[in-house]
Amino acid sequence: MMIINNQIHYPVLLKEVIENLITTKDGIYLDLTIGFGGHSYNIIKILDQKARLIGFDQDLKAIAHCNQLFSEFNNVSLINDNFVNLKKHLQLMQIDNIDGCLIDLGVSSYQLDQADRGFSYHSLGRLDMRMDQNKAVDATKLIQNSTVSELVKIMKNYGEIKDPYRVVVALKKAFEKKELNTLEVVELIKKHVNKAELYANKHPARRYFQALRIAVNNELEVLEKLLSYLPSYLNKGGKIAIITFHSLEEKIVKKVFRHLASISSLNNLPINNELLKKYHNHFNKGLSPTQSELETNRRSRSAKLFVLEKINN
């Protein structure tokens, strides 16, 4: 638990992350979405002084907060950048291998609670949704600059919405007249979705906001690019722990982890012999929060933890 701006924030699946990530107390660990430091602060307290923790975040406010939070530790480095640029930074730091890497793919509680960031469909603010505030295109500009067909594709691919056409047309018409704020967008969505979506258990705007956020931040593309090379940096026994929050992230992580867990360390051919495998996929279906955590932190309800371990060089 952490207090940020008088709000209580809980690192999701913290116990499970610590149990599955830390393999050696004097190793090199990465937190590629350090956010406001909830996971990493608990991790660094367990590690030895010889260990090293490197945290990435594209949100400058998160890095500023972490600079204060970790000021007592001289073995923590913080980098304000998207994790898609990890390889460049590891080369600059002359790091060839790591012992563990955490990636929490969720929007931080702090970002959701800041109405002006535009991530929440419960709060009044500009429809922004940029993780990196220096990016030129936010969600408002994305709607303004995209065609109806482009927006329909975004909603289908990133929101998994079967028929977003009516909502998209209404959005385009509305934004041609003026910029709508988050709550105005929510009302527009409610007005144009079908009754099944309107009265479903989950908020009717949830998938539309998700689709816009993913598109604005290129979330799936950067995740796929990262996972194409990240596992090769692991030392033997090292682990990658990824927390997903929706099925699109989950599909990417599952596909990569399952593929790597089927490859032989000898010749990169598929093999069933566990002794010859290069990687081990710990949780095929992902590890979900306990009932106790769900009762304490509602935002953890869709979280799943996936862990890949390098078992042979």
UniProtKB/Swiss-Prot annotation:
Domain of life: Bacteria
Family per record: Belongs to the methyltransferase superfamily. RsmH family.
The protein, known as: Ribosomal RNA small subunit methyltransferase H
Statement: the UniProt record of this protein carries the keyword Transmembrane helix: no
Subcellular location(s) per record: Cytoplasm
Role played: Specifically methylates the N4 position of cytidine in position 1402 (C1402) of 16S rRNA.
Keywords tagged on the record: Cytoplasm, Methyltransferase, rRNA processing, S-adenosyl-L-methionine, Transferase
A Pfam family of this chain: Methyltransf_5
Gene Ontology MF annotations: rRNA (cytosine-N4-)-methyltransferase activity
One of the GO biological process terms: rRNA base methylation
Residues holding S-adenosyl-L-methionine: 37-39, 57, 83, 104, 111
Record-listed E.C. numbers: 2.1.1.199
Reactions catalysed, as given in the entry: cytidine(1402) in 16S rRNA + S-adenosyl-L-methionine = N(4)-methylcytidine(1402) in 16S rRNA + S-adenosyl-L-homocysteine + H(+)
Annotated Gene Ontology cellular component terms: cytoplasm
Keyword S-adenosyl-L-methionine applies: yes
Native source organism of the sequence: Mycoplasmoides gallisepticum (strain R(low / passage 15 / clone 2)) (Mycoplasma gallisepticum)
